[in-house]
From Swiss-Prot:
Subcellular locations according to the entry: Cell inner membrane
UniProt membrane topology term: Multi-pass membrane protein
Database matches in SUPFAM superfamilies: MFS general substrate transporter
Protein name: Lysophospholipid transporter LplT
Cross-referenced InterPro entries: LysoPLipid__transptr_LplT, MFS, MFS_trans_sf
Molecular function terms from GO: lysophospholipid:sodium symporter activity
Transmembrane feature ranges: 19-39, 53-73, 91-111, 139-159, 164-184, 195-213, 227-247, 257-277, 281-301, 304-324, 352-372, 373-393
Record key words, sorted: Cell inner membrane, Cell membrane, Lipid transport, Membrane, Transmembrane, Transmembrane helix, Transport
Transmembrane helix listed as a keyword: yes
GO CC list: plasma membrane
Amino acid sequence: MSESVRTNTSIWSKGMLSVIVAQFLSAFGDNALLFATLALLKAQFYPDWSQPVLQMVFVGAYILFAPFVGQIADSFAKGRVMMVANGLKLAGAAGVCLGINPFVGYTLVGIGAAAYSPAKYGILGELTTGDKLVKANGLMEASTIAAILLGSVAGGVLADWHVIAALVACALAYAGAVAANLFIPKLVAARPGQSWRLSAMTRSFFCACVVLWRNGETRFSLVGTGLFWGAGVTLRFLLVLWVPVALGITDNATPTYLNAMVAVGIVVGAGAAAKLVTLETVSRCMPAGILIGVVVAIFSLQHALLPAYALLLLIGMLGGFFVVPLNALLQERGKKSVGAGNAIAVQNLGENSAMLLMLGLYSLAVLVGVPAVAIGIGFGVLFALAIAALWIWQRRQASY
């Protein structure tokens, strides 16, 4: 299947809609699988500190394969790369259903996710460009967050009913994503003919890291998105421990409902960013980043469900407004310097290194017995300070 696709085409084109549907199903599977697998660990009496370790093996796959997945995304039609990556996710989820060690199956899903990410974001810059790219990113983030919303809730609710049924639903979602990938137009490879020697690929990747880091705008984007997603994944696991302590609720579903409120908020924030922020006014998103940390600290002190829902909705809105412009900035500047696939692969390395560090610190805090409420307060304060420092740094760099 092939189809000529020009940049600057409508964000409602066949190609873009196919990408969005595939992304929704794949992200639905990712989020349902996380909570279904956490329920499986609970049912098999794994210790609490092993829960973030599950995500750490997933993140470790991103870091290990970071030097290679960007070149893969740029060397082949990105829609086909997405299809193969979703096939790996399907294999991992099916393996957990069939009884293999959940950490092994989840690692395979992580490998698929590592290959998938540069292709899914890189293809946006091939289907559209300029300020339409910000809108396309908003659409992608809205689709992703809708999938997080539904997938997280489905994973928790189904796991309360039957853990294996929840795992089967995840595998079916990945199968649907593979099918949707078939309808993405086969675009010309962005950078064919590159060397496939591991040493050359590694060298090329780290050269891309250097190029992006030396550019003030892309460095700013890399640090900002890394902090955001590192904090976001840590918050998901914090909620799993915080809910029983602060609210006295012990089921699998309530943490997923709370995560869903963050997802709803991100959809709203992403939509606002698409309308209010352009590539030239990215710094408008920074106050929202600082407020995320402030609201997380306030949230950690709550003991009632209704204010918890409201504050998590606000956290999500601030998060969507913060991260969407940073993603668009990196894609646009990175496409021109190192290729969209390599730019996203470098971004993934930064984001997942931040996730690994934050999850490691969180797991250590749980292991030594720090209360969940204290972890939440400290986490929020440190995040606000980190974003404030990044903003000051960016303003100083811009003034030179």
